[in-house]
Amino acid sequence: MRKTRIIASAGLAGAALMGACTNFLNSDKAVQNPNNPTTATTAQLFVGVQANIFGEQEGPVAMIICEWMQQCAGVNGRFVDQQGVYSISAGSFDGSFQSIYTGGGLLQIKQVEKQADAAGDKVTKGMAEVLEAMNMMFGADIWGDLPYSEAAGTNTTPKFDPQMTVYGNLLTLLTNAIADLKGAGGPNPADDLIYGGSTTKWIEAAHTLRARIYLHRVEKLGNGEYTNALAEAQLGISKPADDFKSAHNGATSERNMWAQFQTSSFGNDLVAGSILVDLMTAQGDPRLPDYFGLNPKKTYGGYNVTTQATAVADISPILGSGRTDDDAFSQPIITYDENQLILAEASFKLTGAAAAAPFLNTVRAEYGKAAIATPTLADIMNEKYIALFQNIETWNDYKRTCLPVMHPARSKAVIPGRLFYGQTEEQTNPNTPSSDQQNLFTVRNANDPAACPP
């Protein structure tokens, strides 16, 4: 209410004045605090959603998977028990589970899609749909059954959808995303932190994601899923420059999460794992200095999780590597190398070694490694294990193929195949199985019915 209007109204009866002021104080502009906005623009939401995806892929879940897949090793603090006896609880990854839904998760993704739809912006909607598929795939891969179909509505206790149903829905979602990405509109290129507005790159990434989902269903549905994975990967990421990566800079709150952790007081708690280091050393792989720092002997070595008896002088830190020395390092999330190795695995399973060799050797040639004329499945999966360092997908590959060969931590019969649901979900949603119904060593997700042999 303008000051001149107040002065002009001074002679009005008190009741009328009170009514006018009441209406003013209840108006939208009065109750909205400009420092605490009640709505966000599509662009603001879209940037937040991308940041949340980066956090999911680089955060605590990625670190424990790096341990359990023995690319990394925990030698101090909580990491010793997380790796040595697989000691985790429902509280260990509560924030990670909640990130699927809030803070840039499903609720905000759905809002981006809704606002983009209302604006006739099919391209932004398609990008959000790809991110929705990534987000929910992250959840389904790790926890199996989870809330999805009812999770973004008004139901505060949504049902848990079966994992295989979620995968099927995500395949449909990605088909819709690809169609929308061929439509009109699009974000400001600066707001697309991943591809700068390139719909071609988003479409290729969507096809690689579809190939991933088909791979994740192989163990349950059979080798026919390899045919589908092959077809999708043939349309997937077509060159290394088009990798789907996180975006970071040197600002304290915007650094790569691995770099943040390694430069913290806990950085030395997580070091190199022997399986990965030994594999790379045997192949003369030039990425060793990008992945790990030198050990006290000025060489590269990893901690052996099975024996738990590696000398300190033989262990390489992760700190001091090319990745952790760069606060702005863009973490590879979906890559050309992965896509080529999906083609290699699917071709091997469907046709044989000769069909797989060109795809495997394309990746090996990138790093100056000799071609393998007649590769085995182990050759393919070992190469992918190297390529996907610090990537959650390594766990999915291992659960499907049991490669590379690795043994559980000492005194344990199997490597776990899932995590506990978040504690908050367990406490607030009665549909959540309790922790005592989620034995890490006997309960498997639907797509992974059998544990790998010890």
What is the role of each PLM region?
Residues T4, A15-L45, V49, A133, ...:
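Bacterial Sec-dependent N-terminal signal peptides
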Residues C21-N76, G236, M406-P454:
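Membrane-proximal, proline-rich intrinsically disordered regions
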Residues P60, I386-R400:
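Bilobed periplasmic-binding protein-like "clamshell/Venus-flytrap" ligand-binding domains
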